[in-house]
Amino acid sequence: MYKLIIRPILFWFDPEEVHYFTFSFVKFISKIPGVSSIIRSIYEVKDSRLEREVFGIKFKNPVGLAAGFDKDAKLYKELSDFGFGFIEIGTVTPVGQEGNPKKRLFRLKEDQAIINRMGFNNGGVLEAVERLKKNSGVLIGGNIGKNKVTDNEDAVKDYIICFDALYNHVDYFVVNVSSPNTPNLRALQDKEPLTALLQTLQNRNVEKQKTSTQKVKPILLKIAPDLTDEQLLDIIDIVKTTQIAGVIATNTTISREGLQSSNQSETGGLSGKPLTKRSTEVIRFLSEKSNKAFPIIGVGGIHSADDAIEKLNAGASLVQLYTGFIYEGPALIKAINKKVLGQL
């Protein structure tokens, strides 16, 4: 139904406007008594064999929603009804910001892809915190970044502000230094500044745990697919040095290789089917070269259950959807979970 009727209608309109409309619509129908239960009965796969413990957290299934879809934690409860095992909110920044000028989101239908240059548009971390205070039972990741106006030399302060604010309201953290849409952000992926940033956050993590009843919160690093093998080896060293919990591989790419759509010349990060192979290569490289020293969440171009299985077999412990969710609809979540069960 989604691919035959709903998607063709939605794809007639501007993608960013459709995104906001979809949020409002799902929020509205979920308030109708019984609708959430019906959605869960259609899409949720309940089976204890899907459960897995990764970086000390028990996930009810291995399929999550990637950051960028529910930036401000407005719809995490309703989205979880579609069968996701976890929801990653953000990227959030210390102060709310508009992001880059519109138009900034483009479909590449021929390539089953999206280009975005959103630029960390969000209402600010405190706005997200207020919504997360109402959470009851949804496993949440907090993806954190820096404000556009913050120089890289001061970036650590922005990450600490977001970390402190979200600490009691998320289950794990993701440090985003790999978006191509904030000027100079990717420079923070270089070994020296990245080690310093992650070590500072990890030190803060240990400090906060001492005054909390909670365990140390897992901190993950989200990396770009455009890193060289040498840079990926640096990432492995950094994870081991700072003792963060793991890596999310990968963010969007700046590559435009093999695209057919007329929108391919738009600047921004490319996600979707063209990223499938490269993100899996990065997962396999990190897993093999590190001797599976840390967990990896695989994301990038998952448009089918087979795509997800390929990433899990390459070394990912969990997977996340974004563009595949838009192109394939919520049935993809159920298909992946059923395929995982079929592989057992």
Swiss-Prot record:
GO terms for biological process: 'de novo' pyrimidine nucleobase biosynthetic process; 'de novo' UMP biosynthetic process. It catalyses: (S)-dihydroorotate + a quinone = orotate + a quinol. Pathway: Pyrimidine metabolism; UMP biosynthesis via de novo pathway; orotate from (S)-dihydroorotate (quinone route): step 1/1. Binds 1 FMN per subunit. FMN binds at A67, G68, F69, D70, K71, T91, N143, N176, K222, T250, G272, G301, Y322, T323. Its cofactor is FMN. GO terms for molecular function: dihydroorotate dehydrogenase (quinone) activity. It is an enzyme of class 1 (oxidoreductase). Its EC number is 1.3.5.2. It is found in: Cell membrane. Substrate binds at K71, N116, R117, M118, G119, F120, N176, N181, N251, T252. Keywords: Cell membrane, Flavoprotein, FMN, Membrane, Oxidoreductase, Pyrimidine biosynthesis. GO terms for cellular component: cytoplasm; plasma membrane. The active site is at S179 (nucleophile). It holds the Pfam family DHO_dh. It is a peripheral membrane protein. PANTHER family: DIHYDROOROTATE DEHYDROGENASE (QUINONE), MITOCHONDRIAL (PTHR48109:SF4), DIHYDROOROTATE DEHYDROGENASE (QUINONE), MITOCHONDRIAL-RELATED (PTHR48109). Catalyzes the conversion of dihydroorotate to orotate with quinone as electron acceptor. Monomer. Belongs to the dihydroorotate dehydrogenase family. Type 2 subfamily. This is Dihydroorotate dehydrogenase (quinone). It comes from Flavobacterium johnsoniae (strain ATCC 17061 / DSM 2064 / JCM 8514 / BCRC 14874 / CCUG 350202 / NBRC 14942 / NCIMB 11054 / UW101).
